[in-house]
Amino acid sequence: TDSGTIDNAHYTIATTGARGDAKQIEMVSRYLNRYHNTTYTTCDPAEKSWELQAEQIEMDELEGWGSAKNAVVRFKGVPILYTPSYTFPLDERRKSGMLFPTWGYSEVGGGDFSAPYYWNISPNQDATITPRSIGRRGLSLSGNFRYLNSDNHGEIDASLLPSDDLTGKDRYQFKLNHQGDLETAQLVNPLSYQINYATLSDKQYLSDFGNNLGLSSSDTLEQTATIHYNQDRWAVSALLSDHYTVGTAAEPYRRLPQIDGSWSSESANNQLNYSVEGQFVHFDHSSNSNAERYWIKPSASYNYTLLNDAAYIKPAVSLSQSHYSLDSGSSSSMSVPHYTLESGLFFDRETTTHLHTLEPKIKFNYIPDGKNSGHDFETNSDDSSEFYGKDSAPHTKVVTLSVASDLLSNSDGTKLLSTSLERS
């Protein structure tokens, strides 16, 4: 039978790791249990930070939710919240209701208590609303909103503390991530776009209130808008980029705008393949010189196969050309060739159950003259190769040896094991 009672019980829920003690457990059915005069926690037994103590807790594993009557939430044994009725999730299924509160303490802010509420708006939208009380600062409100539509999706996070009692100023943070596709009658493929925006009321916000919205821990917060289109063998994109500087790092250049384009011939073995990349950027800075950079890189390669495609030799050459024009009136140019020669072998051994592959490879990279434009507009250079970016080209003469091996299942092609080793 699936029903019955157990007195003076200690229980553990295997699927969630939740555990507790109960004066009596009433097993109503296979998936529905009632716990009388009971406790509930998901903390590790060695460190029980919080605990829910209730007159009765009912757990419905079929629905994925639990409910408590006359419940007290304790943190480190100290009662911090009483509620006559409380619901909480048992698994990942979505349902509107209160989530477990959090409690903390800092020397500056004092006691810190949050009580989040989850709102399951619709199958493709949800929100979490979190009132927060910080003893010496006041009351704040945070919100998270997520949405998923057929042609776009995104997430919005925001937090506001009106008139911080310690500083007398409004404190806030805001973060938006949105991306989607735009269908147009004139274009074969949709335009894709993405917006990333994050800002703070002040540079001390993250240290005062914590990084609870998942903002980057780097010294800058990203503020970008991108639109991209590709069709067959060509692609074009446009970018507007700014930053909010959090730490002591130097202010990066804004890109207002950056335009990229690329085209490549139809790639095939045993024939000459062509490609070209180009970029225009207007760099903007509040204190340094503004500038424009024009960059283009044509490339050509030939993938010569032999031994029934078990081996190949691939020579390639490219020419990176950059031109800089500064608002001070000065200009400079840089032109750097890049030569590569790559060769490899492909071995495979098949058994009744597996396919084992082995791919040794050798690659020679050569940039004849070390050059530098004298400019450094990119804190993190979006390198066009592993050896040089658009602002510099160090002299390079490198031979790289590598070997890769895979073990695949014959039944469905699943990669069971992959290893590689490389030495320059």
What are these regions (language model features)?
Residues 1-41, 45-56, 60-424:
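Outer-membrane beta-barrel proteins and related beta-barrel translocases across Gram-negative bacteria
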